């Protein structure tokens, strides 16, 4: 570790290549918040209300949990687009889909860290106002998929920002009764809707990863999207 400082001092760059398993987590640092809803349970509610609508999920554990919930329900994944490795882009992808397929309804399931990374998308979405897009932000105030470090979400008003960007319907769910109500309202409203969901930090220890490739996911999603029977 000391040797790289000498290299940097010469104006050169340094890259570390670390083998999987070389680093361990001693659990001395624990990130928590005061929220009670689990993300996986929130996703389960969204799946129930969305039914045959299309879901665009942000990168990380959100997409992984969505995939496993579909597996547990015996459902296929054709109506889900998993934004693997493209943090912050799911809202823009959802906007493009909503504008090009006004006859279908799209649910963008975002995260607070991802939203902040590309917050400019809110202004573009708010200006376009697609009536068939529901933007759900699961806010746990953390970059949980990469260790749980805090985001800036605790210091900003996400619903206020969405409202200022032109979202006509804005809600904030702090418990499951509110969540169920707001999801149903969004489904029926036929208006661009923003829902912030306060969520606890944490996931199952045995949480797996998608067993299909991103390319396979994309092709199945495109087939379902263009199926005239859907």
Which role fits each region the language model picked out?
Residues 1-17, 21-22:
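Extended, hydrophobic interaction surfaces within ordered domains
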Residues 16-22, 26-58:
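Active-site pocket-lining segments that scaffold enzyme catalytic pockets across diverse folds
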Residues 1-6, 36-45, 49, 68-229:
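Thiamine diphosphate
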Residues 18-24, 59-63, 140-142, 198-203:
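Glycine-rich beta-alpha junction loops
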Residues 54-73:
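Catalytic donor nucleotide-activated moiety binding site of glycosyltransferases and closely related
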